[in-house]
A protein has these predicted regions:
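Active-/binding-site microenvironments in catalytic and ligand-binding cores
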Residues: 1-152
Length: 152
Protein backbone atom coordinates (compact mmCIF):
# COMPACT_ATOMS: atom_id res chain seq x y z
CA UNK A 1 0.00 0.00 0.00
CA UNK A 2 0.96 3.64 -0.37
CA UNK A 3 3.31 4.65 2.45
CA UNK A 4 2.05 7.26 4.89
CA UNK A 5 3.78 10.11 6.68
CA UNK A 6 6.38 9.24 9.26
CA UNK A 7 7.30 11.02 12.49
CA UNK A 8 9.38 14.09 11.74
CA UNK A 9 8.16 14.50 8.15
CA UNK A 10 7.60 18.09 7.04
CA UNK A 11 4.19 18.17 5.36
CA UNK A 12 2.52 20.64 3.04
CA UNK A 13 -1.11 20.21 4.05
CA UNK A 14 -4.48 21.18 2.66
CA UNK A 15 -4.96 23.48 5.65
CA UNK A 16 -1.68 25.28 4.99
CA UNK A 17 -2.60 25.78 1.33
CA UNK A 18 -6.07 27.05 2.24
CA UNK A 19 -4.56 29.42 4.83
CA UNK A 20 -2.38 30.72 2.02
CA UNK A 21 -5.44 31.51 -0.08
CA UNK A 22 -5.71 28.45 -2.36
CA UNK A 23 -9.51 28.34 -2.21
CA UNK A 24 -9.83 32.05 -3.05
CA UNK A 25 -7.30 31.98 -5.89
CA UNK A 26 -8.63 32.05 -9.43
CA UNK A 27 -5.39 30.92 -11.03
CA UNK A 28 -4.09 28.18 -13.29
CA UNK A 29 -0.72 28.06 -11.53
CA UNK A 30 0.41 27.80 -7.92
CA UNK A 31 3.90 28.45 -6.59
CA UNK A 32 4.69 26.95 -3.19
CA UNK A 33 7.66 28.38 -1.33
CA UNK A 34 8.59 26.45 1.82
CA UNK A 35 10.13 27.93 4.95
CA UNK A 36 12.80 28.63 5.86
CA UNK A 37 13.44 30.12 2.43
CA UNK A 38 17.22 30.03 2.50
CA UNK A 39 19.35 30.83 -0.56
CA UNK A 40 21.16 27.53 0.11
CA UNK A 41 18.17 25.79 -1.53
CA UNK A 42 19.81 26.64 -4.85
CA UNK A 43 22.80 24.35 -4.20
CA UNK A 44 21.63 22.10 -1.37
CA UNK A 45 22.42 18.39 -1.32
CA UNK A 46 18.84 17.28 -0.73
CA UNK A 47 19.93 13.72 0.11
CA UNK A 48 21.80 14.97 3.20
CA UNK A 49 20.03 16.06 6.35
CA UNK A 50 16.30 16.08 6.99
CA UNK A 51 13.91 15.10 4.22
CA UNK A 52 12.39 18.01 2.31
CA UNK A 53 8.74 18.94 2.77
CA UNK A 54 6.22 17.16 0.58
CA UNK A 55 2.50 17.37 -0.16
CA UNK A 56 -0.13 15.25 1.60
CA UNK A 57 -2.71 13.40 -0.49
CA UNK A 58 -5.38 15.82 0.78
CA UNK A 59 -3.27 18.80 -0.29
CA UNK A 60 -2.87 17.39 -3.79
CA UNK A 61 -6.62 16.73 -4.07
CA UNK A 62 -7.28 20.36 -2.99
CA UNK A 63 -4.85 21.65 -5.63
CA UNK A 64 -6.61 19.66 -8.36
CA UNK A 65 -10.06 20.72 -7.08
CA UNK A 66 -8.93 24.37 -7.22
CA UNK A 67 -8.22 23.95 -10.94
CA UNK A 68 -4.46 24.36 -10.68
CA UNK A 69 -2.83 23.20 -13.94
CA UNK A 70 0.76 24.21 -13.18
CA UNK A 71 2.33 23.48 -9.79
CA UNK A 72 5.75 24.96 -9.01
CA UNK A 73 7.60 24.00 -5.83
CA UNK A 74 10.99 24.68 -4.27
CA UNK A 75 11.62 21.11 -3.16
CA UNK A 76 13.01 18.21 -5.21
CA UNK A 77 9.62 16.46 -5.36
CA UNK A 78 5.98 16.92 -4.47
CA UNK A 79 6.21 13.37 -3.07
CA UNK A 80 8.05 11.99 -0.07
CA UNK A 81 11.69 11.32 -0.93
CA UNK A 82 11.50 7.61 -0.10
CA UNK A 83 7.98 6.65 -1.20
CA UNK A 84 8.89 3.30 -2.80
CA UNK A 85 8.14 4.65 -6.27
CA UNK A 86 4.45 5.29 -5.69
CA UNK A 87 4.66 8.99 -6.66
CA UNK A 88 1.27 9.49 -5.05
CA UNK A 89 1.22 13.27 -5.37
CA UNK A 90 2.17 13.15 -9.03
CA UNK A 91 -0.52 10.54 -9.71
CA UNK A 92 -3.20 12.60 -7.98
CA UNK A 93 -2.14 15.74 -9.85
CA UNK A 94 -2.32 14.02 -13.24
CA UNK A 95 -5.53 12.13 -12.40
CA UNK A 96 -4.07 8.63 -12.23
CA UNK A 97 -5.07 5.82 -9.90
CA UNK A 98 -2.42 4.28 -7.61
CA UNK A 99 -0.03 2.12 -9.66
CA UNK A 100 -1.78 3.04 -12.94
CA UNK A 101 0.24 3.12 -16.14
CA UNK A 102 -2.58 4.73 -18.14
CA UNK A 103 -2.17 8.06 -19.89
CA UNK A 104 -2.81 10.98 -17.53
CA UNK A 105 -6.30 12.47 -17.41
CA UNK A 106 -4.71 15.93 -17.15
CA UNK A 107 -2.02 15.74 -19.87
CA UNK A 108 -1.50 19.51 -20.05
CA UNK A 109 -0.81 19.82 -16.31
CA UNK A 110 2.81 20.43 -15.28
CA UNK A 111 4.88 20.09 -12.12
CA UNK A 112 8.04 22.17 -11.83
CA UNK A 113 10.31 21.18 -8.95
CA UNK A 114 13.40 22.78 -7.41
CA UNK A 115 12.54 26.37 -8.26
CA UNK A 116 13.82 29.18 -6.05
CA UNK A 117 11.74 32.25 -5.35
CA UNK A 118 13.72 34.75 -3.25
CA UNK A 119 12.13 36.55 -0.30
CA UNK A 120 12.44 39.77 -2.32
CA UNK A 121 9.58 38.41 -4.48
CA UNK A 122 6.44 39.13 -2.45
CA UNK A 123 3.49 36.75 -2.32
CA UNK A 124 0.81 37.81 -4.76
CA UNK A 125 -0.52 37.47 -8.27
CA UNK A 126 1.86 37.15 -11.20
CA UNK A 127 1.75 36.34 -14.88
CA UNK A 128 3.75 33.16 -15.45
CA UNK A 129 5.73 32.31 -18.56
CA UNK A 130 6.62 28.66 -18.00
CA UNK A 131 8.78 28.00 -21.07
CA UNK A 132 8.76 24.20 -21.42
CA UNK A 133 10.51 22.67 -24.45
CA UNK A 134 8.36 20.37 -26.62
CA UNK A 135 9.96 17.10 -25.52
CA UNK A 136 7.87 13.93 -25.80
CA UNK A 137 8.91 12.52 -22.43
CA UNK A 138 7.75 12.34 -18.83
CA UNK A 139 10.16 15.08 -17.70
CA UNK A 140 11.60 18.20 -19.28
CA UNK A 141 13.38 21.29 -17.98
CA UNK A 142 11.38 24.48 -17.62
CA UNK A 143 12.28 28.10 -17.12
CA UNK A 144 9.52 29.83 -15.18
CA UNK A 145 9.51 33.63 -15.39
CA UNK A 146 7.25 35.72 -13.16
CA UNK A 147 5.85 39.12 -14.08
CA UNK A 148 4.10 41.07 -11.30
CA UNK A 149 0.52 42.07 -11.97
CA UNK A 150 -0.67 45.50 -10.94
CA UNK A 151 -4.27 46.40 -10.18
CA UNK A 152 -5.69 49.08 -12.44
Amino acid sequence: SVPGAEAGDRLITRGALESGGLAAADSEALIVRTLPNEASKRTRDWSAGPLPAYFTREAMHAIVAAGIEHLLVDSPSIDRTHDQGYLTGHRIFWGLEDESTDAPRRPEATVTEMIFVPDSTPDGLYALSLQVPPFATDAAPSRPLLYPLESV
